[in-house]
Amino acid sequence: VWDMIKEHYSILFCSLTGNTKKLADAIYETLPKDKCDYFGTNDSQVPQSDVCYIGFWTDKGNADQKTLELLSKLKNKKIFLFGTAGFGGSDAYFEKILGQVKQSIDASNTVIGEYMCQGKMPQAVRDRYVKMKEQPDHMPNLDLLIANFDRALSHPDKKDLDKLRELVRG
């Protein structure tokens, strides 16, 4: 097992609604500050650190475009993936997303950890579902989508962040 306390690291993230930034903050608070080479948003610059914590938001079952671009440029890095998705409640769903994301990672890299949790969505999403329900021939699963939206409102919560911190500590 490599020692994450001794190695220099960078934390790069894309966060559309602030959910993934919460995860990034939790990682930053957990690791030794003096070993941090970079903490901030992903501007697609390849970090110098050997260890990279890469955070994304989910877009159509994969990481956002900016994150995928960065991942495809990384070589010989130790990568810890973390992300949020509006739809939650199923580890299998998160596994599927992470599987997609990992296809953009070069074989010279090692994925040393991965974590995903649900993240709240903008109110406009719920409003759209409610509007769609008013149509006579609406999708049958709208009630489920609205229930999922409401469940997501509290996430990432303390439990989500604690679980991530535990993984990062190793």
Regions found by a protein language model. Give the residues of each.
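Short, Lys/Arg-enriched N-terminal segments with co-localized hydrophobic residues
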Residues: 1-3
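Short acidic low-complexity segments
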Residues: 37-48
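FMN-binding flavodoxin-like domain, especially the glycine-rich phosphate-binding loop
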Residues: 5-7, 30-34, 49-54, 59-170
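The conserved SAM/SAH-binding core of class I Rossmann-like methyltransferase domains
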Residues: 12, 39, 82
